[in-house]
Amino acid sequence: MAHQKILILDFGSQVTQLIARRVREQQVYCEIHPFDVSDDFVREFAPAGVILSGGPNSVYEAVGWHAPQSVFELGVPVLGICYGMQTMAQQLGGSVESSGKREFGYAEIRARGHSELFRSIEDRTNDEGHGLLDVWMSHGDKVTALPPGFKVIASNESCPVAGMADEVRKFYAVQFHPEVTHTIKGRDMLARFVHEICGCGRDWNMPDYVNEAIEKVRAQVGQEEVILGLSGGVDSSVVAALLHRAIGEQLTCVFVDNGLLRLNEAEQVMLTFARNLGVKVIHVDATEQFMGHLKGVSDPEAKRKIIGREFVEVFQAEANKLPNAKWLAQGTIYPDVIESAGSKTGKAHTIKSHHNVGGLPETLNLKLLEPLRELFKDEVRELGIALGLPHEMVYRHPFPGPGLGVRILGEVKQEFAELLRRADAIFIDELRAADWYDKTSQAFAVFLPVKSVGVMGDGRTYEYVVALRAVETQDFMTAHWAELPHSLLGKVSNRIINEVRGINRVVYDISGKPPATIEWE
């Protein structure tokens, strides 16, 4: 199916992905590409509209950091955001200068000039009846002269041109960021742009995308066999369900139990995929192999490397038993692709692999199949539901690739893994029972390799400590510790201490990100 598309050109903003997510939320397909794509690429992409992102540079200093001229010659609407507004102004004959000081944070602007972009969109009105908008600014330059044909559509004292438009050509630009949640009516503005100004319908949704994705896989794979490293995480689980629906017996999954999984995770994966869905799954219990190589190792990075290396070894051994497999499937998702886009945006040039298959040797000689590479995480979850996966599996909290290996501080021992598994399961059970699981973005227990004195009954105990961690976040770039009810924390602590022999103290981590990271290692 040919979707109407929005082209987003990335000038290096930290929040460019948010633009794409907001557009996709409107059920409109879009793609992010580096700003320096060729004119031919822009024409062949055939967008219904173009969005120019923000960026860290100044248009009068960054030589060559401008949009392809074809963007303004296609005859389609264009929206410039922050730096995107400045390059639009400069390229079309206006002027941009330094503001003298950066404007960062909340700002109130007045909508002016009866623009189509802002029509009936306001947070409130002033005494004269003019529409006012609460927006988020992040800029050090400003437009000082409009290009021919443009008018001011938004302003405030510190930013006389907070928005501009050429309504005839449908070129719009704003100095603020409509994609961030701090701009209260930002979603409404982007919806107005893609639906009413660009004329896009709502033809991008996961239930309808299932058949399209299945056809893509069948066309790519044909009659050849595929191997997938199934971890039990959201991405690989959705890939497994999609490929099984598309190619059935041509798919073989390899599930490696490294001894660092959550409680009953191996059983749940086998039940869901092998027994309920009928997927061909090879279950490899490599606990002893992993634990043996982790013995005596305390450094977090060293542990990660060992766990990754041993996974590769186990997976390769199983792959060698499947000589007919021609494809390696991975759970690469769209943010991975964006982050590896490279170009002058200064982003990494190496594709970031799915954590379980990272570093698989090229000697496998397998072609790469990445059926989720166009999807954001929320879309992957929606696709999983559309494919019939259980809600509890699809909406599970993130789990690190090395598993409990980086939630056991210091040396990893099987005994520690068992204690942590049970404590973590109690925490998650109680969060679910209290309807707090879906209110938190990530929650887990951490094993601390220290002992503390306690009293149980009439006896003294000297046992281990577990820390509980729960955070709320929209993007995992920053996070706030979840303010769980004290009664809930008390119940979790009481259960862990009474039910998990070997733990006599439970603490709660109230660190935000920054300065702390979400995971402890």
Curated annotation (Swiss-Prot):
It catalyses: XMP + L-glutamine + ATP + H2O = GMP + L-glutamate + AMP + diphosphate + 2 H(+). Pathway: Purine metabolism; GMP biosynthesis; GMP from XMP (L-Gln route): step 1/1. GO terms for cellular component: cytosol. Residues 204-396 form the GMPS ATP-PPase domain. Coiled coil: none annotated. It is an enzyme of class 6 (ligase). Pfam families: GATase, GMP_synt_C, NAD_synthase. This is GMP synthase [glutamine-hydrolyzing]. It comes from Aromatoleum aromaticum (strain DSM 19018 / LMG 30748 / EbN1).
